[in-house]
Amino acid sequence: MAEVAETPSVEAQEEVAQPAEAQVLEAKNGDAKKDPAPAAEEAAGGFTKQERAIIRQVEYYFGDANLNRDKFLREQIGKNEDGWVPLSVLVTFKRLASLSTDLSEIVAALNKSEEGLVEISEDKLSLRRHPERPIPEHNEERRKEIQERTAYAKGFPLDSQISELLDFAANYDKVVNLTMRKHYDKPTKSYKFKGSIFLTFETKDQAKAFLEQEKIVYKERELLRKWQVDYLKEKQEEYAQKNEKRKNKKEAKPEPAFELPKNAIVVFEGAPETSSREEIREAFEKIKDFEVAYIEFAKGETKGSVRLTEADAAEKYIAKVEEGKLKFKDEVSLSLRKATEEEEKEFIDKAIEFMKKRRDFTRNKGKRFNRKRHGGNDHKHGGGKKARGD
């Protein structure tokens, strides 16, 4: 029977983020609409539609794909020395509960299964995975083996239900896992079906037979089909191209250059060692029609530089000061002169370097703020328990 995986899987991010590597995507079950009432008569093989759905769902719970990631169910299995899980626990799982909560009905359906995966206890109140069917170790080798027998199919209506897709999968021998691929829709804050699925077959030959069929039509739509490994490789290449294009675009757009006015630096000497930068500014700003942009001066020194905001302002400023002497305080005057070309170049280079560092710091600070704002440290968010999706 097919194992069911209807999911907001990690691949739901693919529209906006680049995967680190091609990977077999894990999934969790979500809510499902209740299937229509089963037909009274038995279908081919002696199963009603309701029985098939119950068997399919329970065997999914105990199947390889689900047990490898379902921590809650593994915990329930571990509570009993022999691995029995009470049916009363299983019927709390949303999808099984949507089919039936009648324990006798579930047991009766499972008694008809020929898979031999699930065993029923003598009192008919508990189930377990058959001891002769141990869970395969989930490692890199196993991941690749699963990927090699998984197909990708696209073209399903966006409003498709999991039950409809399972009915579709039942036509092919033999699908053991079906993943509905979804994306997160921001306006509705919900996961929506993308119209494509992954089908994992029991063997690679079965997957190959599905892919090699000349044409498969679902509800008058021809499906696009390919190996999952090929699909993931194409996506990786697509992401790499997008990133390269984005990188090239960024490199093609140079950072705006910092330009400072020329001939705007006045060098002063004769300041008392106790002078502060604020006092220097106050003295320079007494000369009207000139604006101070930056002062390079450290307390304890007697010499420094003042950059004015406009080009060619240095000579004009000095011309307004009597004999090149700027009154400071306590009858102290500062001797002024225009900076030499070498001094000006050194001053401007240092100023531009400082401005670049400040710009980079501000930009990185903004990025850090946005990461925190949008949940960059996911492990620190959400103190409550995560609801179990079954």
Swiss-Prot record:
Secretion signal span: none
GO molecular function per UniProt: 5S rRNA primary transcript binding; DNA binding; mRNA binding
Entry annotated with the keyword Repressor: no
Domain HTH La-type RNA-binding: 44-137
Record's compositionally biased regions (Basic residues): 362-374
A Pfam family it matches: La
Residues with the Phosphothreonine modification: 7
GO biological processes: positive regulation of translation; tRNA processing
Residues where Phosphoserine is found: 9
Span list, region Disordered: 26-46, 362-390
Keyword vocabulary terms for this entry: DNA-binding, Nucleus, Phosphoprotein, RNA-binding
Compartment list: Nucleus
Source species, domain of life: Eukaryota
Major localisation: nucleus
Residue ranges annotated for the xRRM domain, each copy included: 259-386
GO cellular component: cytoplasmic stress granule; cytosol; euchromatin; nucleus; ribonucleoprotein complex
Residue ranges of domain RRM in the record: 149-234
Residue stretches of biased makeup (Basic and acidic residues): 375-390
InterPro entries, alphabetized: La_dom_prot, La_HTH, La_xRRM, Lupus_La, Nucleotide-bd_a/b_plait_sf, RBD_domain_sf, RRM_dom, WH-like_DNA-bd_sf
Alphabetical list of SMART domains matching this protein: LA, RRM
Protein task: May be involved in transcription termination by RNA polymerase III. Binds RNA and DNA. Binds to precursors of RNA polymerase III transcripts. May play a specialized role during fly development.
Name of the protein in question: La protein homolog
Organism: Drosophila melanogaster (Fruit fly)
